[in-house]
């Protein structure tokens, strides 16, 4: 416990907040190459086969990114755009792949929340 005189001399040091998306190096998105595309199971109590990919980013960091939406066309060596955003029931998955950009196609037959999944407006 410092004395008041010590606080007057030195003051308190601010705590530095830890960055949640360190691999993006301050960018909103990063481009990367898929090194492995696979499925994994979520934590309890959920049950599914979640689609994820290991991606080597242009910042030379390899991360695990979630592939949102139903169905995808990704395989090894696909170029993808990665954004921040964790998946709560997949430990270690702190990034998401942006659908509809670079080699990633949008979700087919998507009617609502289309912009999140890179789906074009359907011709009526």
Swiss-Prot record:
Here the segments flagged for biased composition (Basic residues) are 108-118
An example Pfam family from this entry, by short name, is Ribosom_S12_S23
Keywords carried by this UniProt record = Methylation, Ribonucleoprotein, Ribosomal protein, RNA-binding, rRNA-binding, tRNA-binding
Q: Does the keyword NADP apply?
A: no
**Family note:** Belongs to the universal ribosomal protein uS12 family.
| Annotated protein name in UniProt | Small ribosomal subunit protein uS12
Q: What is an annotated GO biological process for this record, any one?
A: translation
List the InterPro entries hit by this protein, alphabetically: NA-bd_OB-fold, Ribosomal_uS12, Ribosomal_uS12_bac
Does this entry carry the keyword Thylakoid? Answer: no
GO terms, molecular function: rRNA binding; structural constituent of ribosome; tRNA binding
Q: What is the originating organism of this protein? A: Mycolicibacterium smegmatis (strain ATCC 700084 / mc(2)155) (Mycobacterium smegmatis)
Instruction: State what this protein does.
Output: With S4 and S5 plays an important role in translational accuracy. Interacts with and stabilizes bases of the 16S rRNA that are involved in tRNA selection in the A site and with the mRNA backbone. Located at the interface of the 30S and 50S subunits, it traverses the body of the 30S subunit contacting proteins on the other side and probably holding the rRNA structure together. The combined cluster of proteins S8, S12 and S17 appears to hold together the shoulder and platform of the 30S subunit.
What GO cellular component is one of the record's annotations? small ribosomal subunit
Where is the region Disordered?
Answer: 105-124
């Amino acid at each position: 416990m410092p004395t008041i005189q010590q606080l007057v001399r030195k003051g308190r040091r601010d705590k530095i907040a830890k960055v949640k998306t360190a691999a993006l190096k301050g960018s909103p998105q990063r481009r990367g190459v898929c090194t492995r595309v696979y499925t994994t199971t979520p934590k309890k109590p959920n049950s599914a086969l979640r689609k994820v990919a290991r991606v080597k980013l242009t910042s030379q960091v390899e991360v695990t990114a979630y592939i949102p939406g139903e169905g995808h066309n990704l395989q090894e060596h696909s170029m993808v755009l990665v954004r921040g955003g964790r998946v709560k029931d997949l430990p270690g998955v702190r990034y998401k792949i942006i659908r509809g950009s670079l080699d990633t196609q949008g979700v087919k037959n998507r009617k609502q929340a289309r912009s999140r999944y890179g789906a074009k407006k359907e011709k009526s």
